[in-house]
Amino acid sequence: MRFEEAFQGWSGGRLTQAEAAMLLGQCERSFRRHVERYKADGLEGLLDKRLSQRSQRRAGPAEVDQVVQTYKSGFAGWNVAHFHSKYRSEFKGVRSYSWVKTVLQGAGLARTAKRRGKHRIKRERAPLVGMMLHQDASTHRWVPEQVWDLVVTMDDATGEHTSMFFCDQEGTASSFHGLGQTIARYGLFASLYSDRGSHYFLTPQVGGKVDKTHLTEVGRALKQLGIEHIAAYSPEARGRSERAFQTHQGRLPQELARAGITTMDGANRYLEHTYRAGHNREFCVASTLPGTAYVPFISGSLPDILCEHHERTVGNDNSVSFEGLSLQL
């Protein structure tokens, strides 16, 4: 029903105020307010005056152009979320991600993303920090003409990266390095979740179960430290790590290029002094439970555990042979 009809019914005594308001789908208070406007200005009085007023919060052309030029001058090719992070942290921008995305898309600098399908049900995070950590690696062209492995150790409860560094190829040494950095910074944790790479587990049959009795050097070290080792049996099981690497592959090459970094040493310094802390600030979430499952490492020498152990037989001359060398004891 149109307002005029309801107004005439009410003013003619055929409808009560409550009935007229109900027919219009509004409360009595709104109906009374509209009656006052209608009596004063007619139908024009019923129009929402806000529609003809410029919002005080609306960005002006100068601000829009500044964002566009900032993106063009130093961030061309960056995804919107990555640029928005720098826009807020480095340029003290106050606009929302959606606003920045709309501006860049309007300028033809960002693509409109395709609608995503229904998301799968996520695995629940560990409720307490230090209960479960992930360790994984991603092979990628992080700088021009260079393919490295990025090794990340991450807390499942919060997503905090406890260690991340580049190396030529992941393996036993890189696993030890990531574990050593994590334990030195936070302490011993309860369990490690990893893929079934040959440096983590021995797998007698391709695609089969891992051998929990014959341990790799990483497995031996974890057992010695009292850390449970959990094997992932599908890429989907490592989804949290995979999504983190998608973020790193979309951001790190641009950040390293912007900083003029082309060497592994320089890239690792950037990870340690700049990138890891910034990533943790932006992406970490609060754990379900307060407190921590980390405990201090106080027994023995950590480097003596996080290294390869090889058994050798001592000869009659008190020497052992190792990789073609004769070592005197």
Predicted regions: what is each one?
Residues 18-24, 83, 87:
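Short alpha-helical "recognition helix" segments of helix-turn-helix
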Residues 136, 255-270:
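Short, charged, surface-exposed loops that flank catalytic or proteolytic processing sites
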Residues 274-329:
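C-terminal, beta-rich DNA-binding module of retroviral/retroelements integrases
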Residues 42-141, 204, 209, 213, ...:
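Basic, flexible linker segments flanking DNA-binding modules
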Residues 29-32, 98:
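Key DNA-contact positions within bacterial/archaeal DNA-binding proteins
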Residues 1-15, 64-74:
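Short, amphipathic alpha-helical "recognition" segments used to contact nucleic acids or chromatin
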Residues 192-196, 206-252, 264, 268:
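RNase H-like two-metal-ion nuclease catalytic core shared by retroviral integrases
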Residues 62, 93-94, 105-160, 168-189, ...:
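Mobile-element integrase/transposase regions
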